[in-house]
Structures are given as structure tokens and as C-alpha cells.
Amino acid sequence: MSVSVCPCGSGNLLDACCGHYHAGTPAPDAQALMRSRYSAYVLGLVDYLVATTLPAQQADLDRAAMAAWSAQSTWLGLEVESAEVLGGQPEHGFVTFTARWHDQDGDHQHRERSAFVQHAGRWYFIDPTVGLKAGRNDPCPCASGQKFKKCCASYVGS
């Protein structure tokens, strides 16, 4: 049992917060998944970061770059500005946040409005840096069974 405070900024212990998501419990919503992904970067849990990215994008992730960024950064904090659940089937959500870190080039902060989709009881991050190989009338890569244009297309800027 970990007695360390969770890096996500909740103030809770890691095991009572993001730690159980890292151990396999599905995050209950997009904000919890986003917080657990930040904690995974802090803790160097690249397998978790890959597993919580939309499955159709996982093969194209640069695991080595993710691991290097995680290891070479001192993580300074996470601020969640807003979380929106849009409903529908499948359920989509957005989380707006700012992450701060320090590396050999100095202090940095990154503000992002991340998109998420829920499928089969699990939330997934839709990575804007990894293209989705789907035409508008193709089945959606999130495996919802809907056409891409009726599902995730508007959430990935395609």
C-alpha cells in the first residue's frame, strides 16, 4: 500500500486515487482518466498511457518518446479547468487542463482541451497527435459501430 500523495493534485493517497486505475480499475469518467494519465506520466507508467489511448491509435504511439519525456521531466502540477460530458452513444467528453513541468530547458506549461470517448465501459483518450485512419463513412475507430462522421470525427478535428 502506497502512502504517497497522488500526483494528480487531488490531495488523496495514490492508492485511493489514480493508483487503482493504474492497477486496472476503469476510470469512471473522462476527468478521472485524464488525471490518472497525468499521474502515469509522473510515475513513468507508459504501458498505462498506451492502454488508455484509443485502441485504434495505440500502435502509432511513440512509446520511447513518451518514456523519455516522462523520465526527463520534473512534474510540477496539474490544474483541471473544466470537464464536460457530452452524452450520446458512445459517450464523449472533454477535459480542459494545464500541466506544468520542468526539464533541462526550463519550466513549461501546456494547456489542452482533450477529447475522450467511452467504449465497453472504459474511457479512452483520443490523441490529437496520432491520426485516425478512417474516412467519414467508415466505421468509427472507437468501435462504436457508428460511422466515423456520426461519432468521433467532430472530436478529433477531422
Swiss-Prot record:
Pfam families: SEC-C (PF02810), YchJ_M-like (PF17775)
Top-level taxon of origin: Bacteria
Recorded family membership: Belongs to the UPF0225 family.
Protein name (record): UPF0225 protein PputGB1_4297
